[in-house]
């Protein structure tokens, strides 16, 4: 955990989570995991498949409740909130970027980016204006009327990032944002995400198996068997520990 938590975006303290139908079939996925994400930093969550990364992130975002421990998002304890409150709070404060772009092929880029705004009650006019501004932010301001099928993979991921940013969330959560991209395009996406974290002073959390992007992190949290094994902070320490990983 970072020494300075005054700029804390989200925290998980001693989180436990099991799945199964009874004592004999219980699978203990999280075993006392603790993690903190801060504003202005890019945090990478790494570890082998099945170690609990997705479950941990689901609890941090309020889409899953822990069996024990405390989840806090921007100062609010999620366990003390009603499901409807969590849904609204998550929608206001978190933007999501996934491995699959999930763009609607029949809609223009602006219409795709505007979808979450329209769902949350924004007028069509305001949603379109905000969508165009978000697309300009990711370098696609001249493609607002283009359909997704005419874009490269990297450009489609930029649209997905614009959609995540359109409502100005304080936390961006990314699940394998570069795995479907080539090295050069992935580097461009990571440069942009780091800019969002460091320059815009947002919190960015990335779940990844891609060692090529470790160098972009301000901090790396390594998970194994339902626990956070260790955290590495600082570019030098990250480079020494992780950048020698074969890839």
Which residues does each predicted region cover?
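ABC family nucleotide-binding domain
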Residues: 9-216, 220-223
């Amino acid at each position: 955990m970072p020494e300075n938590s005054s700029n804390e975006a989200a925290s998980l303290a001693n989180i436990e989570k099991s799945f199964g139908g009874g004592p004999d079939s219980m699978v203990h996925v999280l075993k006392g995991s603790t993690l903190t994400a801060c504003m202005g930093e890019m945090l990478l969550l790494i570890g082998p498949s099945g170690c609990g990364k997705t479950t941990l992130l689901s609890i941090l975002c309020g889409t899953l409740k822990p069996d024990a421990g405390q989840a806090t998002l921007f100062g609010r304890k999620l366990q003390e909130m009603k499901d409807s409150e969590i849904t609204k709070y998550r929608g206001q404060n978190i933007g999501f970027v996934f491995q699959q772009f999930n763009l609607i092929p029949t809609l223009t880029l602006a219409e795709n980016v505007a979808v979450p705004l329209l769902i949350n009650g924004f007028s069509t006019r305001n949603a379109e204006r905000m969508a165009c501004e978000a697309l300009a932010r990711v370098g696609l301001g001249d493609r607002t009327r283009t359909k997704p099928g005419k874009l490269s993979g990297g450009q489609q991921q930029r649209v997905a990032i614009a959609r995540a940013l359109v409502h100005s969330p304080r936390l961006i959560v990314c699940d394998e944002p570069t795995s479907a991209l080539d090295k050069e395009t992935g580097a461009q996406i990571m440069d942009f995400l780091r800019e969002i974290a460091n320059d815009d002073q947002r919190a960015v959390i990335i779940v990844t198996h891609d060692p090529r992007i470790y160098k972009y992190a301000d901090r790396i949290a390594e998970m194994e068997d339902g626990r956070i094994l260790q955290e590495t902070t600082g570019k030098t320490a990250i480079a020494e520990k992780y950048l020698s990983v074969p890839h």
